Structure formats: structure tokens, C-alpha cells
Regions:
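Glycan-recognition and catalytic cores of secretory/periplasmic carbohydrate-active enzymes
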Residues: 1-152
Length: 152
């Protein structure tokens, strides 16, 4: 997939891409005024659309962990940080209020609970990891900030 940013250098054996990283990079690059008009900036919309089509379940809004070069699920685990990055990226999409609200509700219902969050769900949507690693709050905080700016 030449329109997405791969996890390994181009041409590397057994390469893949992670929708969560695509959405994170989309947000960071799309929000940068320094990239406006560049070839990279122009390709962002196509990369977002492809990643959303291949890496997000249209029924549940679940973002899978990894896709192979053809865009098929290589790891269908659903990690909370990827869900948060997708939600944050949606805040920069045109006419996205309904999508943002739908994805926010999915995040709340599937991953958040009174004591914190579920780190991972398996391909069937069952909780597969209950610990709460210290790397996740970064993604939740930046998602929250994006939501505050978007929703006002």
C-alpha cells in the first residue's frame, strides 16, 4: 500500500501497517500548517480513507491492530489506543460530527469502565487484556484534547 505509512522500510519482508498509527499520523500531519500543499499532505486523505475502509469494522467501529500489505487483517486485536487515535483523527475530517459522536459512544461502551479501561479486545470483541499500561493515557489525553477542540 503505497499511500499508507508502513511499519518497516518499503520493500522489507513481511511488512504491515497499523491503522492506529495511520490515524495518529493523519492527525499529526493534517494539523501541521507546515505541510499544507505538500505531496505528503495531498496523500493524507487517500491514506485515511483506505485505512478506515480496511481497518475499521463498520458495524462496531472497532479498529484492528494490524493489516498486511493487501489490507487484510494480520492481527484483529482491538487496542484502546488505536480506537482513541481513530476518534481523534475523525475530528479533523470534513462534516464528521455524526461519525465523531458515534465513535465516541463506541469507545465509551466497549473500552471504558468506572475503574479505567480495557486495554484490548480480541477479534470477537471479548476483553483479552485487563491491565492498564502507562502508555495508554497519552492516547486518551490527546484524544480528549481533540474532542474538546472539536466539540467546544
Amino acid at each position: 500500500q503505497q499511500c499508507v505509512l508502513m511499519e518497516k522500510p518499503l520493500g522489507a519482508v513481511d511488512n504491515w501497517f497499523e491503522p492506529g498509527h495511520q490515524f495518529e499520523w493523519y492527525f499529526l500531519l493534517e494539523s501541521s500548517p507546515l505541510l499544507r500543499g505538500s505531496a505528503l499532505h495531498v496523500s493524507l486523505d487517500h491514506a485515511f480513507t483506505l485505512t478506515e475502509q480496511r481497518g475499521v469494522d463498520p458495524q462496531t467501529g472497532a479498529v484492528v491492530a494490524m493489516l498486511d500489505l493487501e489490507g487484510s487483517a494480520k492481527d484483529a486485536t482491538q487496542r484502546i489506543w488505536a480506537q482513541a487515535e481513530y476518534l481523534r483523527a475523525l475530528t479533523l475530517r470534513p462534516e464528521s460530527e455524526a461519525s465523531v459522536l458515534r465513535q465516541l459512544q463506541a469507545l465509551q461502551q466497549r473500552f471504558l469502565h468506572a475503574g479505567g479501561w480495557y486495554e484490548c479486545r480480541d477479534e470477537n470483541g471479548e476483553v483479552s487484556r485487563k491491565d492498564m499500561p502507562s502508555t495508554t493515557p497519552y492516547h486518551l489525553a490527546t484524544c480528549y484534547r481533540g474532542l474538546v477542540e472539536f466539540l467546544g
